[in-house]
Amino acid sequence: MLAAVYKSINLGKVGERMVDISTEKLEELENEVTSQNTKLKKMEEFVSPDKLYQELIQSVRKYHPSADISLIEKAYRVARESHEGQVRKSGEPYIIHPLCVAIILADLELDKETIVAGLLHDVVEDTVMTEEEIAKEFNPDVALLVDGVTKLAQLSYDADKVEKQAENLRKMFLAMANDIRVILIKLADRLHNMRTLKYMTPEKQKEKARETMDIYAPIAQRL
């Protein structure tokens, strides 16, 4: 699913520098992201985090009817408390983002630990919670996934050195992620972030769009 969505929003040949990304192209990019995934459309209809959480559980139940959701429920509670008071540029409560990331991962029918890590993927970077606390509260596997996503988020991207740096970053991205699930969480994170592209400044929109096309889309297509 992720590869198909990222492929659909490709604005140019992989590896070639995009000379210009117009406002129309940015709008097209956003439209493609949402139109290619019905779940993303459904997410926009939910305002309450609790309703989104129920959507997540329903998604998990579809491929794992007998799943013990206690760990997922705990992760939702911890993530909601950790991100309390934080809002996204869209004005939404921040918890909406990790919930939507988790739903995308559930659409891929990933294991419980990946869903939990999706819910917690920003807590180390954006809150006072530590990797050690995640390992203690959940398990070492979840902590390693969250740590992997956090480290990938620290990779810097210079839009002025696209072609050479993009390939190097893709290699670093894949090398740093010892577990394929880390990459899937990061791709789901970026996919949902593209939904709120319009709330960023024009300069930031171009930066994120180019980064998505040069770094994330090629990786998604390799999976």
Short names for language-model regions:
Residues 2-223:
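Active-site helical microenvironments for divalent-metal-assisted chemistry
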